[in-house]
Amino acid sequence: MSKGSSTKKWLHEHTSDYYVIQANKLGYRSRASFKILEIQNKYQLFKPNMFVVDLGAAPGGWSEQVIKYIGKNGKLIALDLLEMAPIAGVEFIQGDFSSDETYQKLNTLVNNQKIDCVISDMAPNLSGNKTSDQAKSIYLLELALDFANTNLNKNGSFVAKVFQGQGSDEYLKLVRESFNKVIQFKPKSSRAKSREFYVIATEFKG
């Protein structure tokens, strides 16, 4: 299949996707909003006054939902390599999470406060090389887990997108070392053919 044909196929699938259509109807920023809503409905992670950090946040599908749960007295920091239009109550950092400069900016905003929940929908820019792309994905996941391990409150929680493949089982073992409860969850709003699932980790051991 030519590149042009594959692009047309993706556009058709995207524009006819139920969750894309629903997101447009409801004014959500992306279909990803439904994933975090499913996670919240099932696990009740977000509560008023919580401090949450959203990694890989653009275009804001998760942040726009989470801020509703934590309220005006909560705190939400969102970070992404791409631009993100402002969301009321959300502090945004644009930068590469794997760079020291961006990490320092995030730490400055965190300001030594303990975080209640770290959420990550990060994914690498895909090269088309499955082995390389999977390795990059696991690297970002490890960075997100390291950040959570350093900054979470005792009994805090961690949510991250994982692509099933080389290194994913080993990654889950690392998560289990830090949290008492670790669950694999695939939202209904995930595309059926996608290898993604979400790790829902609660009761951080501290």
Curated annotation (Swiss-Prot):
Catalytic activity: uridine(2552) in 23S rRNA + S-adenosyl-L-methionine = 2'-O-methyluridine(2552) in 23S rRNA + S-adenosyl-L-homocysteine + H(+)
Subcellular location: Cytoplasm
InterPro entries: RNA_methyltr_RlmE, RNA_MeTrfase_FtsJ_dom, rRNA-MeTfrase_E, SAM-dependent_MTases_sf
Superkingdom of the organism of origin: Bacteria
Protein name: Ribosomal RNA large subunit methyltransferase E
GO MF annotations in UniProt: rRNA (uridine-2'-O-)-methyltransferase activity
Amino acids binding S-adenosyl-L-methionine: 60, 62, 80, 96, 121
Biological function: Specifically methylates the uridine in position 2552 of 23S rRNA at the 2'-O position of the ribose in the fully assembled 50S ribosomal subunit.
Record: active site: 161
Transferase found in the keyword field: yes
Highest classification ranks of the organism: Bacteria, Pseudomonadati, Pseudomonadota, Gammaproteobacteria, Thiotrichales
Native source organism of the sequence: Francisella tularensis subsp. novicida (strain U112)
Enzyme nomenclature, EC number: 2.1.1.166
